[in-house]
Amino acid sequence: EGLAMLRAVLDDFRAWGGVRTTTTRDYRLTNASLSADKVVELSPQDHDEVLEKLAGQCTAALIIAPESDGILASLSALMVRNGARLLGSGPGSVATAADKWACHRLFTQAGLPTPDTCYADADGACKAAEKIGFPLVIKPVDGVSCEGISLIPDVPSLHSVLEKSRYVDRRFLLQRYIEGEHASACLLVAGNDNLCLSINRQFIEIDRPFSYQGSEVPFTGDKHQAAITLAQRAAALVPGLKGYIGVDLLIANEGCYGIEINPRLTTSYIGLRSVVNLNLAQAIWEASIQNILPRNVVLQGKFAFRKENLI
Protein backbone atom coordinates (compact mmCIF):
# COMPACT_ATOMS: atom_id res chain seq x y z
CA GLU A 1 0.00 0.00 0.00
CA GLY A 2 2.81 2.39 0.88
CA LEU A 3 4.62 1.82 -2.40
CA ALA A 4 1.39 2.23 -4.38
CA MET A 5 0.65 5.53 -2.62
CA LEU A 6 4.20 6.75 -3.23
CA ARG A 7 4.02 5.94 -6.93
CA ALA A 8 0.64 7.64 -7.25
CA VAL A 9 1.64 10.89 -5.55
CA LEU A 10 4.97 11.06 -7.42
CA ASP A 11 3.12 10.62 -10.72
CA ASP A 12 0.78 13.45 -9.71
CA PHE A 13 3.64 15.78 -8.76
CA ARG A 14 5.28 15.07 -12.12
CA ALA A 15 2.01 15.70 -13.98
CA TRP A 16 1.59 19.01 -12.12
CA GLY A 17 5.13 20.14 -12.90
CA GLY A 18 5.24 22.72 -10.12
CA VAL A 19 8.02 21.10 -8.09
CA ARG A 20 11.04 18.85 -8.39
CA THR A 21 10.81 15.71 -6.27
CA THR A 22 13.30 13.65 -4.32
CA THR A 23 12.07 10.43 -2.75
CA THR A 24 13.58 7.86 -0.48
CA ARG A 25 13.27 4.17 -1.31
CA ASP A 26 13.81 1.15 0.89
CA TYR A 27 17.02 -0.61 -0.12
CA ARG A 28 15.02 -3.85 -0.55
CA LEU A 29 12.91 -2.25 -3.31
CA THR A 30 15.68 -1.55 -5.82
CA ASN A 31 13.51 -2.82 -8.68
CA ALA A 32 10.59 -0.52 -7.84
CA SER A 33 10.39 2.19 -10.49
CA LEU A 34 9.51 5.67 -9.18
CA SER A 35 8.85 8.84 -11.19
CA ALA A 36 10.87 11.15 -8.94
CA ASP A 37 13.59 13.49 -10.16
CA LYS A 38 15.93 11.88 -7.63
CA VAL A 39 15.72 8.58 -5.73
CA VAL A 40 17.76 8.07 -2.55
CA GLU A 41 18.04 4.57 -1.13
CA LEU A 42 17.52 4.09 2.60
CA SER A 43 18.85 1.37 4.86
CA PRO A 44 18.38 0.96 8.64
CA GLN A 45 21.99 1.97 9.25
CA ASP A 46 21.72 5.46 7.74
CA HIS A 47 17.96 6.07 7.92
CA ASP A 48 17.83 9.13 10.19
CA GLU A 49 21.07 10.63 8.90
CA VAL A 50 19.86 10.57 5.29
CA LEU A 51 16.44 11.97 6.18
CA GLU A 52 17.97 14.82 8.19
CA LYS A 53 20.22 15.74 5.28
CA LEU A 54 17.34 15.65 2.78
CA ALA A 55 15.10 17.69 5.08
CA GLY A 56 17.71 20.44 5.08
CA GLN A 57 17.82 20.46 1.28
CA CYS A 58 14.10 20.51 0.47
CA THR A 59 11.36 23.11 0.65
CA ALA A 60 8.69 20.73 1.89
CA ALA A 61 8.19 17.07 2.72
CA LEU A 62 5.26 14.69 2.33
CA ILE A 63 5.59 11.67 4.59
CA ILE A 64 3.99 8.32 3.77
CA ALA A 65 4.27 6.29 6.97
CA PRO A 66 2.09 4.51 9.55
CA GLU A 67 1.08 6.47 12.63
CA SER A 68 1.45 3.37 14.84
CA ASP A 69 4.25 3.31 17.44
CA GLY A 70 4.72 7.06 16.90
CA ILE A 71 6.46 6.53 13.54
CA LEU A 72 4.62 9.23 11.58
CA ALA A 73 4.83 11.78 14.41
CA SER A 74 8.55 11.09 14.86
CA LEU A 75 9.31 11.47 11.15
CA SER A 76 7.23 14.65 10.99
CA ALA A 77 9.18 16.10 13.91
CA LEU A 78 12.48 15.14 12.26
CA MET A 79 11.53 17.00 9.09
CA VAL A 80 10.41 20.14 10.93
CA ARG A 81 13.48 20.08 13.16
CA ASN A 82 15.72 20.11 10.10
CA GLY A 83 13.97 22.95 8.30
CA ALA A 84 11.41 21.30 6.01
CA ARG A 85 7.79 22.41 5.84
CA LEU A 86 5.28 19.60 5.99
CA LEU A 87 2.84 18.76 3.22
CA GLY A 88 0.64 17.40 5.94
CA SER A 89 -0.13 17.61 9.63
CA GLY A 90 2.31 18.65 12.33
CA PRO A 91 3.75 16.12 14.80
CA GLY A 92 1.48 17.23 17.64
CA SER A 93 -1.73 16.82 15.68
CA VAL A 94 -0.46 13.52 14.24
CA ALA A 95 0.13 12.21 17.77
CA THR A 96 -3.37 13.24 18.86
CA ALA A 97 -5.12 11.74 15.84
CA ALA A 98 -3.05 8.54 16.03
CA ASP A 99 -4.35 7.88 19.56
CA LYS A 100 -7.69 6.14 19.01
CA TRP A 101 -8.75 6.73 22.60
CA ALA A 102 -8.00 10.45 22.32
CA CYS A 103 -10.02 10.53 19.10
CA HIS A 104 -12.93 8.75 20.74
CA ARG A 105 -12.97 11.26 23.59
CA LEU A 106 -12.87 14.17 21.14
CA PHE A 107 -15.81 12.67 19.25
CA THR A 108 -17.90 12.14 22.38
CA GLN A 109 -17.08 15.58 23.83
CA ALA A 110 -18.20 17.17 20.55
CA GLY A 111 -21.39 15.12 20.46
CA LEU A 112 -20.41 13.17 17.35
CA PRO A 113 -21.92 9.69 17.06
CA THR A 114 -19.29 7.04 17.75
CA PRO A 115 -19.54 3.46 19.07
CA ASP A 116 -19.43 2.94 22.85
CA THR A 117 -15.77 2.36 23.74
CA CYS A 118 -13.73 1.43 26.83
CA TYR A 119 -10.01 1.89 27.45
CA ALA A 120 -8.78 -1.27 29.17
CA ASP A 121 -5.94 -3.61 29.98
CA ALA A 122 -5.91 -7.39 30.35
CA ASP A 123 -6.90 -7.26 34.05
CA GLY A 124 -9.90 -5.04 33.42
CA ALA A 125 -10.95 -6.45 30.05
CA CYS A 126 -13.79 -8.68 31.24
CA LYS A 127 -15.38 -5.91 33.30
CA ALA A 128 -15.08 -3.49 30.38
CA ALA A 129 -16.54 -6.11 28.03
CA GLU A 130 -19.57 -6.51 30.29
CA LYS A 131 -20.13 -2.77 30.06
CA ILE A 132 -19.86 -2.75 26.25
CA GLY A 133 -21.63 -6.06 25.63
CA PHE A 134 -20.86 -8.79 23.10
CA PRO A 135 -20.15 -8.92 20.23
CA LEU A 136 -17.45 -6.30 20.48
CA VAL A 137 -14.29 -5.22 18.69
CA ILE A 138 -10.83 -5.14 20.25
CA LYS A 139 -8.22 -2.82 18.75
CA PRO A 140 -4.85 -1.33 19.71
CA VAL A 141 -4.77 2.28 20.89
CA ASP A 142 -2.68 3.05 17.83
CA GLY A 143 -2.44 1.17 14.56
CA VAL A 144 -3.07 1.46 10.84
CA SER A 145 -5.56 -0.16 8.49
CA CYS A 146 -7.06 -3.17 10.32
CA GLU A 147 -3.87 -3.93 12.23
CA GLY A 148 -4.65 -5.86 15.41
CA ILE A 149 -8.45 -5.44 15.15
CA SER A 150 -10.59 -8.50 15.94
CA LEU A 151 -14.28 -9.28 16.38
CA ILE A 152 -14.91 -10.85 19.81
CA PRO A 153 -18.19 -12.79 20.14
CA ASP A 154 -17.83 -13.98 23.76
CA VAL A 155 -15.64 -14.17 26.88
CA PRO A 156 -13.60 -17.25 25.82
CA SER A 157 -12.72 -15.52 22.55
CA LEU A 158 -11.65 -12.43 24.47
CA HIS A 159 -9.32 -14.49 26.67
CA SER A 160 -7.87 -16.15 23.56
CA VAL A 161 -7.08 -12.83 21.88
CA LEU A 162 -5.60 -11.33 25.05
CA GLU A 163 -3.02 -14.11 25.15
CA LYS A 164 -1.47 -12.72 21.96
CA SER A 165 1.70 -10.70 22.35
CA ARG A 166 0.14 -7.50 20.97
CA TYR A 167 -2.09 -7.17 24.04
CA VAL A 168 0.22 -8.50 26.76
CA ASP A 169 1.14 -5.67 29.16
CA ARG A 170 -0.52 -3.10 26.91
CA ARG A 171 -3.72 -1.12 27.04
CA PHE A 172 -6.26 -1.37 24.23
CA LEU A 173 -9.79 -0.40 23.23
CA LEU A 174 -12.95 -2.47 23.46
CA GLN A 175 -15.65 -1.08 21.18
CA ARG A 176 -19.27 -2.00 20.57
CA TYR A 177 -19.66 -3.88 17.30
CA ILE A 178 -22.20 -2.28 14.97
CA GLU A 179 -23.37 -3.85 11.73
CA GLY A 180 -22.92 -1.54 8.79
CA GLU A 181 -20.90 -0.45 5.80
CA HIS A 182 -17.25 0.30 6.48
CA ALA A 183 -16.43 3.62 4.85
CA SER A 184 -13.82 6.35 4.81
CA ALA A 185 -13.62 9.98 3.81
CA CYS A 186 -10.82 11.75 1.94
CA LEU A 187 -10.42 15.37 3.01
CA LEU A 188 -8.18 18.36 2.44
CA VAL A 189 -7.52 20.66 5.39
CA ALA A 190 -6.28 24.24 5.06
CA GLY A 191 -6.13 26.41 8.15
CA ASN A 192 -9.51 26.29 9.87
CA ASP A 193 -11.33 25.00 6.80
CA ASN A 194 -11.67 21.54 5.35
CA LEU A 195 -13.20 19.99 2.26
CA CYS A 196 -14.49 16.45 1.91
CA LEU A 197 -13.42 15.18 -1.51
CA SER A 198 -15.08 11.76 -1.36
CA ILE A 199 -16.77 9.11 0.73
CA ASN A 200 -15.40 5.65 -0.02
CA ARG A 201 -16.48 2.08 0.60
CA GLN A 202 -13.88 -0.07 2.34
CA PHE A 203 -13.70 -3.79 1.63
CA ILE A 204 -13.09 -5.30 5.08
CA GLU A 205 -13.02 -8.99 5.93
CA ILE A 206 -14.58 -9.35 9.38
CA ASP A 207 -12.47 -12.02 10.99
CA ARG A 208 -9.94 -12.49 13.74
CA PRO A 209 -8.16 -10.26 12.87
CA PHE A 210 -9.99 -7.89 10.50
CA SER A 211 -8.37 -7.53 7.10
CA TYR A 212 -8.46 -4.51 4.78
CA GLN A 213 -8.84 -5.72 1.18
CA GLY A 214 -9.38 -2.55 -0.85
CA SER A 215 -11.74 0.33 -1.57
CA GLU A 216 -14.31 1.74 -3.97
CA VAL A 217 -14.22 5.48 -4.70
CA PRO A 218 -16.65 7.15 -4.41
CA PHE A 219 -19.37 5.47 -2.34
CA THR A 220 -22.80 7.06 -2.44
CA GLY A 221 -26.13 6.29 -0.82
CA ASP A 222 -28.93 7.82 1.19
CA LYS A 223 -26.54 8.71 4.05
CA HIS A 224 -23.89 10.25 1.78
CA GLN A 225 -24.41 13.85 2.93
CA ALA A 226 -24.58 12.79 6.58
CA ALA A 227 -21.25 11.00 6.14
CA ILE A 228 -19.67 14.11 4.60
CA THR A 229 -20.93 16.32 7.44
CA LEU A 230 -19.66 13.88 10.09
CA ALA A 231 -16.23 13.60 8.44
CA GLN A 232 -15.84 17.38 8.22
CA ARG A 233 -16.88 17.85 11.85
CA ALA A 234 -14.43 15.16 12.93
CA ALA A 235 -11.57 16.74 10.97
CA ALA A 236 -12.19 20.07 12.69
CA LEU A 237 -11.67 18.57 16.16
CA VAL A 238 -7.88 18.17 15.99
CA PRO A 239 -5.96 21.47 15.84
CA GLY A 240 -3.09 21.52 13.38
CA LEU A 241 -4.33 18.98 10.87
CA LYS A 242 -3.26 20.02 7.40
CA GLY A 243 -3.20 18.77 3.82
CA TYR A 244 -4.68 15.37 3.04
CA ILE A 245 -6.29 13.32 5.82
CA GLY A 246 -8.72 10.44 6.09
CA VAL A 247 -11.62 9.79 8.46
CA ASP A 248 -12.89 6.26 9.02
CA LEU A 249 -16.65 5.92 9.28
CA LEU A 250 -19.32 3.28 9.80
CA ILE A 251 -22.57 3.74 7.90
CA ALA A 252 -25.33 1.79 9.67
CA ASN A 253 -29.09 1.64 9.19
CA GLU A 254 -29.62 4.05 12.07
CA GLY A 255 -27.00 6.56 10.94
CA CYS A 256 -23.29 7.30 10.56
CA TYR A 257 -20.60 6.79 13.20
CA GLY A 258 -17.15 8.35 13.41
CA ILE A 259 -14.43 5.78 14.10
CA GLU A 260 -11.03 7.47 13.82
CA ILE A 261 -8.92 10.08 12.04
CA ASN A 262 -5.95 9.19 9.81
CA PRO A 263 -3.62 12.24 9.70
CA ARG A 264 -1.83 11.19 6.52
CA LEU A 265 -2.16 10.01 2.95
CA THR A 266 -4.50 6.99 2.83
CA THR A 267 -4.78 4.14 0.36
CA SER A 268 -8.03 5.61 -1.00
CA TYR A 269 -5.87 8.32 -2.61
CA ILE A 270 -5.15 5.76 -5.34
CA GLY A 271 -8.81 5.52 -6.26
CA LEU A 272 -9.64 9.19 -5.72
CA ARG A 273 -6.97 10.46 -8.13
CA SER A 274 -8.60 8.38 -10.87
CA VAL A 275 -12.04 9.99 -10.56
CA VAL A 276 -11.44 13.58 -9.40
CA ASN A 277 -11.13 16.56 -11.76
CA LEU A 278 -7.97 17.99 -10.17
CA ASN A 279 -4.36 17.12 -9.51
CA LEU A 280 -4.32 15.90 -5.92
CA ALA A 281 -0.61 16.52 -5.38
CA GLN A 282 -1.04 20.15 -6.38
CA ALA A 283 -4.11 20.39 -4.13
CA ILE A 284 -2.12 18.99 -1.18
CA TRP A 285 0.65 21.53 -1.80
CA GLU A 286 -1.79 24.44 -2.00
CA ALA A 287 -3.70 23.34 1.11
CA SER A 288 -0.53 22.78 3.16
CA ILE A 289 1.63 25.69 2.00
CA GLN A 290 -0.86 28.32 0.82
CA ASN A 291 -3.95 27.46 2.92
CA ILE A 292 -6.01 27.21 -0.27
CA LEU A 293 -8.73 24.62 -0.87
CA PRO A 294 -9.84 23.69 -4.40
CA ARG A 295 -13.19 24.79 -5.79
CA ASN A 296 -15.68 23.08 -8.07
CA VAL A 297 -14.46 19.57 -7.29
CA VAL A 298 -16.22 16.96 -9.42
CA LEU A 299 -15.99 13.16 -9.26
CA GLN A 300 -16.57 11.25 -12.48
CA GLY A 301 -17.17 7.50 -12.48
CA LYS A 302 -16.02 4.97 -9.91
CA PHE A 303 -12.69 3.30 -9.21
CA ALA A 304 -12.45 0.07 -7.21
CA PHE A 305 -9.26 -1.73 -6.31
CA ARG A 306 -8.04 -4.71 -4.31
CA LYS A 307 -4.95 -4.44 -2.17
CA GLU A 308 -3.21 -7.39 -3.79
CA ASN A 309 -3.46 -5.72 -7.21
CA LEU A 310 -1.95 -2.36 -6.26
CA ILE A 311 1.59 -3.10 -7.47
Residue ranges and their predicted role:
Residues 1-13:
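Short catalytic helix/loop segments, enriched in acidic residues and glycine
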Residues 66-69, 142-143, 264:
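Short glycine-rich anion-binding loops that position phosphate/pyrophosphate groups of nucleotides
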Residues 94-181, 189-194, 216-229:
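Active-site nucleotide/adenylate-binding loops and adjacent lid/helix of ATP-dependent enzymes
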Residues 176-239, 251, 262-288, 299, ...:
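ATP-dependent carboxylate/phosphate-activation module, predominantly the ATP-grasp catalytic core
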